[in-house]
């Protein structure tokens, strides 16, 4: 009987390993409305300034002092501004790295100056979980995670410090699951909703910024 233990153990391990599944897929990334559309107007040189979290989210006495939401928002904004095809977006975050590479190459940098600085603020951000049940939960119950974000973008003239144009964008993202008679999907806390709703709000703000340019409400200079 003792000789059977190693065999049974090996079979058990193989059976458990056979239950493990692995899968992957690519997900299409949403882009601004003007992405890959024709444009013959002025592409004003702009840089992205500070993007701060002005909401109450992660700004309490127990926060670590690192503006993770603002840093994430700035990265998203740079990407959407560039993909809009309406601006010449200048990088000011990796200045030392760019200077190092130019030095290694033996070339002198010829930095381009920005006519405008785009600053941003997360003015509203929040998450909540709402639930419902049918016939006291006997016929089913559900849970929905909801994330909401609102951002403001200000375009500042670098020569005069005048705020020449302002736009806002807001978005809401939700994740739902429902269980009926003990059967159904269950979903834990999804931290990716923060990034998704932030991307949605900033994308809407950039769409509004592009609309302002194309409608003539803001006429950027080159």
Could you describe each region identified by the protein language model?
Residues 13-16:
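Bacterial Sec-type N-terminal signal peptides, specifically the leucine/valine-rich hydrophobic h-region
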Residues 19-90, 94-102, 175, 181-187, ...:
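A structural "domain/chain start" motif
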Residues 21-25, 97-164, 174-177, 183-188:
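Surface-exposed short loop/turn segments
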Residues 170-172:
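Short beta-strand edge segments in extracellular beta-sheet folds
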């Amino acid at each position: 009987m003792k000789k059977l233990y190693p065999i049974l153990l090996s079979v058990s391990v193989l059976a458990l390993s056979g239950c493990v599944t692995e899968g992957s897929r690519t997900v299409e990334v949403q882009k601004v409305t003007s992405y890959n559309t024709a444009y013959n107007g002025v592409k004003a040189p702009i840089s992205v300034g500070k993007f701060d979290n002005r909401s109450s989210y992660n700004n309490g006495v127990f926060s670590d002092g690192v503006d993770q939401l603002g840093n994430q928002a700035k990265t998203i904004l740079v990407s959407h501004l560039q993909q809009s095809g309406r601006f010449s977006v200048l990088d000011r975050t990796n200045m030392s790295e760019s200077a190092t590479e130019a030095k290694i190459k033996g070339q002198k940098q010829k930095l381009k100056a920005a006519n405008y600085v785009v600053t941003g603020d997360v003015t509203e951000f929040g998450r909540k979980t709402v639930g419902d049940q049918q016939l006291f939960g006997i016929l089913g119950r559900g849970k929905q995670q909801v994330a909401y974000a609102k951002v403001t973008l200000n375009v500042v003239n670098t020569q005069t410090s005048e705020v020449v144009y302002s736009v806002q964008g807001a978005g809401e993202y939700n994740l739902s699951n429902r269980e009926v008679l003990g059967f159904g999907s269950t979903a834990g806390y999804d931290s990716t909703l923060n990034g998704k709703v932030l991307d949605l709000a900033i994308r809407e703000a950039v769409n509004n910024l592009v609309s302002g340019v194309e409608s003539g409400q803001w006429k950027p200079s080159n």
